[in-house]
Regions:
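Short, surface-exposed linear motifs at loops/turns and structural transition points
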Residues: 74-189, 212
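Predominantly extracellular beta-rich ligand-binding scaffolds that present long acidic/polar faces
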Residues: 1-79, 177-180, 184-480
């Protein structure tokens, strides 16, 4: 109610004026210029931090001049923007506000963003967004609405927008559907954070590939403690790249996340022990790091890298000459922390030429940080040396940090040695750090390398053992 005791400077608005879609107009009409502070941002959707307030049950009012980072309603409303997934059995799931029907089982074959309705849309929708420095207007045709089941209908946003190669400096992109403006990030699953998100969801092969493609641009936008949280299993071989991928073609090569010393990986990736399957891992042509991650200076937790029904390889592309390179399945080099991670089924291949140094390991190429509870099964580590220095180990090519409670199963082979120096070991090709409570079962083959069952007698080892002379690998599921 209202009356003589209203606070000075306030104007009464009844329920109808503040509910549903009318609230965007009401905020402009009744608040007028109440928010005039310049904060360097664009138009915004305000974020209601007060529990129990009426506005929390509806879309947030649109305010101008305030930087905005979170766009999702507190309560789901039909006829709004949602994140959606398509599964191998033909079913759909979506996430919007407090409504979620996405699954943690089965295989995701496609994902994206779109408008969801509880009945068939009555008319076509006009969509406006910026792309390539120009304003684009497109139409979502009601005749193309997809029956998602459960009484919901989906009109997907244009693929050119969902798979844009542009990275917004505000992290979120703006899209206007009819008279409503939304902010979202098409490269990942939706975030509910009011500011630059402290946690970003990774759910599909497209999203993990986007992290590889655009990490260099996203890295300076995110706080150092930002967590990239994997929320379900990811399978590259089962994803429908033709209909949902960036280029419409199957991903045959993925570069490391944090692919150089200029832009290393500095954040937190938590795999949640969900498998990541069938990723074709290659360095950039002439790059110094190869693996799922390149140079890790952040934290990798609970990452399980597998190959599915066939073996895949980690490859160093280009000619390695007069420089140092690092190759491993999980990471090329670790200067940060790795905890409770596993890799299985990835062969590692590289060749070293004049004046170069190559560190190769089944798990990481080189460790200068801390690794605890790491495991790897490598069908083959294969390399050659031509007047170069080559250091190979079933677990890591070199270690100057700490490795504990870890093990490796591998088949390590040097094809050719011409000059230079080659060290071949079951666990670590070089060790000037510390290795604790770890073991390996490794077959070593070399025409003339310095060969060690576990690691060279340098550095420190404690409670470690090795088994050599056979061929070993995991079979079946990987359990952490």
């Amino acid at each position: 109610s209202h009356g003589d005791h209203d606070m000075d400077g306030t104007v009464f608005a009844d329920y109808e004026q503040w509910s549903g879609r009318s609230r965007a107009d009401a905020i402009e009409k009744y608040l007028n210029d109440a928010f005039t502070a310049e904060t360097g941002g664009s138009d915004t959707v305000a974020y209601n931090l007060v529990d129990g307030m009426g506005l929390g049950a509806y879309s947030y009012p649109r305010l101008t001049g305030l930087t905005h980072y979170g766009d999702w309603q507190a309560q789901f409303e039909a006829g709004t923007l949602v994140y959606y997934e398509v599964y191998s059995d033909g079913s759909y799931g979506f996430r919007g506000a407090n409504k979620s029907t996405v699954k943690t089982t089965g295989t995701v074959v496609g994902d994206g963003y779109g408008m969801v309705y509880s009945t068939l849309p009555e008319q076509d929708l006009t969509v406006r967004y910026s792309l390539g420095g120009r304003e684009v207007t497109s139409t979502l045709y009601r005749a193309n609405a997809i029956d998602m089941g459960g009484g919901y209908y989906l009109l997907p946003l244009p693929r050119t927008l969902v798979n844009t190669t542009e990275v917004s400096t505000d992290f979120y992109r703006r899209v206007q559907v009819e008279d409503t403006t939304y902010y979202f990030n098409p490269h990942f699953t939706c975030s509910e954070a009011p500011e630059a998100p402290s946690e970003i969801g990774i759910r599909t092969a497209r999203q993990l590939n986007n992290l590889s493609l655009y990490y260099e641009q996203y890295s300076p936008l995110l706080a150092k403690d930002t967590t990239l949280q994997q929320e379900r299993s990811i399978d590259y071989s089962g994803y429908d790249w033709a209909n949902y991928g960036r280029s419409g073609a199957v991903v045959t090569s993925q570069q490391p996340i944090g692919s150089s010393a200029v832009v290393p990986f500095t954040h937190i990736y938590d795999g949640g022990t969900y498998p990541i399957a069938a990723v074709p891992l290659q360095s950039p042509n002439g790059g110094d790091y190869a693996g799922l991650f390149g140079l890790n200076q952040g934290s990798l937790r609970n990452v399980v890298l597998t190959t599915g029904e066939q073996d895949y390889s980690v490859t160093l592309r280009g000619i390695l000459r007069l420089r140092t390179a690092y190759v491993g399945a999980l990471a090329g080099r670790n200067d940060g922390t790795v905890y409770n991670c596993a890799a299985a089924g990835y062969s590692v291949t590289a060749h070293a030429y004049q004046g170069s140094v190559l560190y190769m390991g089944g798990f990481v190429g080189y460790n200068a940080g801390t690794i605890r509870s790491g495991s790897v099964s490598t069908p083959s580590l294969t390399a050659s040396s031509n007047y170069a220095r080559l250091l190979m180990g079933g677990f890591t090519g070199g270690n100057s940090g700490l490795v504990s409670q870890s093990y490796a199963m591998a088949n390590v082979e040097v094809l050719q040695i011409r000059g230079g120096g080659v060290a071949l070991s079951g666990f670590a090709g070089e060790n000037i750090g510390s290795i604790r409570s770890s073991y390996c079962a490794t077959a070593l083959t070399s025409p003339g390398a310095d060969t060690y069952g576990f690691a060279p007698a340098t550095g420190s080892t404690s409670g470690c053992c090795y088994l050599s002379g056979g061929t070993y690998r995991f079979v079946g599921q990987v359990h952490l």
